[in-house]
């Protein structure tokens, strides 16, 4: 069962589901994913890396890794670096701002777009309609900084 079978286009997904999904689809299965995030890409990666590497985030922050963990981190960072993930951490205020990435989405054959915290002024149905025109599924989430 894939994401499209589980959730209809335009579904709202929790962060607890989205981050492992990004890992499974984008990194492991190499399916292109585009993410609009409302935090810096560094903050987002600081959330994703501990989950993907399965290394305690406090150990990463404090730089207290064993040699084996350093090797694992190096391997996982290489996989993450080579994954077909596109991050947009630029503030988005209109549907046209989202559409500005359409060329990349089409060229890279991106199948899944995740949008973090859709601004209230933007009509979700317009984004869903655009996704159907271009040929990708869009999912909405809210990444909180824990």
Located regions from the model:
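Walker B catalytic acidic pair
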Residues: 116-118
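Glycine-rich P-loop/Walker A and Walker A-like loops and their local beta1-loop-alpha1 context
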Residues: 6-27
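C-terminal regions of RecA-like/P-loop NTPase motor modules
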Residues: 95-113, 129-137, 146
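Structured core elements
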Residues: 11, 33-36, 86, 114, ...
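Residue-level marker for well-ordered alpha-helical positions
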Residues: 19-20, 99, 125
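Substrate-engagement module of ASCE P-loop NTPases
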Residues: 23, 27, 120-146
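Active-site-proximal structural scaffolding
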Residues: 15-18, 37, 41, 123, ...
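Cytosolic-facing regulatory segments adjacent to core modules
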Residues: 3-4, 28-109, 122
């Amino acid at each position: 069962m894939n994401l499209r079978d589980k959730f209809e286009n335009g579904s709202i997904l929790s962060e607890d589901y989205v981050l492992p999904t990004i890992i499974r689809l984008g990194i492991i299965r190499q399916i292109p994913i585009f993410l609009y995030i409302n935090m810096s890409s560094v903050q987002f990666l600081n959330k994703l890396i501990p989950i993907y590497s399965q290394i305690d985030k406090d150990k990463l922050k404090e730089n207290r890794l064993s040699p084996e963990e350093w090797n694992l981190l190096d391997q996982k960072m290489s996989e993450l670096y080579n994954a077909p993930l596109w991050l947009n951490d630029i503030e988005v205020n209109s549907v046209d701002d989202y559409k500005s990435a359409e060329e990349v989405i089409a060229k890279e054959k991106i199948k899944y777009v995740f949008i973090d915290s859709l601004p209230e002024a933007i009509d979700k149905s317009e984004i869903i309609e655009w996704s159907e025109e271009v040929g990708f599924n869009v999912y909405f989430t809210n990444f909180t900084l824990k």
